């Protein structure tokens, strides 16, 4: 009985000293995937998280962030041509066409300016036929006049006479070029209409001219000059 007890005790001691298979960092399941090729590893082939063949995060074949096949940010082929687009050419101001502005000097007319558009005046010609003819054809007559600065004339009559002649001439030439002709009645009515418009233009220009002159006299007076010098 004593011999049997000693043999059983020895077997139990040997069992406690034997290593258990499949522990941490042994031939069993391991993490991370290093060591025995037969182990159950995750990831399976030594790459980073989500990398079948190695590379950065989310990169099937290597490259920068979010790049399936390499290259810079947001570029499939690695060339930086997304940020170097040529700027659009600026519009050439010489190619912008426009009508002559009111008050601007008209080229080719020797310093004449084009006045602002006016409403054609209501004129009575003394008989029903001409009155009716004017009402029906007034849209064919000018609503702007050509003129020179008032300081180039001695009086209103000279200004108006020159204004009427150049305006009717220019309007007739322009309209005839378009294939429309004027009768004697048209010319008579245009003279009356344009004359009234030239008188209105003279009054506007004279008022503006004298206002500019008054301002110059005011600012050139000695008290005002002294006051401005003191303020400066």
UniProtKB/Swiss-Prot annotation:
Segments for region (4 X 8 AA tandem repeats of P-H-G-G-G-W-G-Q): 44-84
| GO MF entries | copper ion binding
Record-listed Cu(2+) 1 binding positions: 46-47
Q: By its UniProt entry, which Pfam families does this protein fall under?
A: Prion (PF00377), Prion_bPrPp (PF11587), Prion_octapep (PF03991)
Subcellular localization, as worded in the UniProt entry:
Cell membrane; Golgi apparatus
Associated clinical condition = PrP is found in high quantity in the brain of humans and animals infected with the degenerative neurological diseases kuru, Creutzfeldt-Jakob disease (CJD), Gerstmann-Straussler syndrome (GSS), scrapie, bovine spongiform encephalopathy (BSE), transmissible mink encephalopathy (TME), etc.
The family line of this record is: Belongs to the prion family.
What is the name listed in the Swiss-Prot or TrEMBL entry for this protein?
Major prion protein
What species was this sequence derived from? Ateles geoffroyi (Black-handed spider monkey)
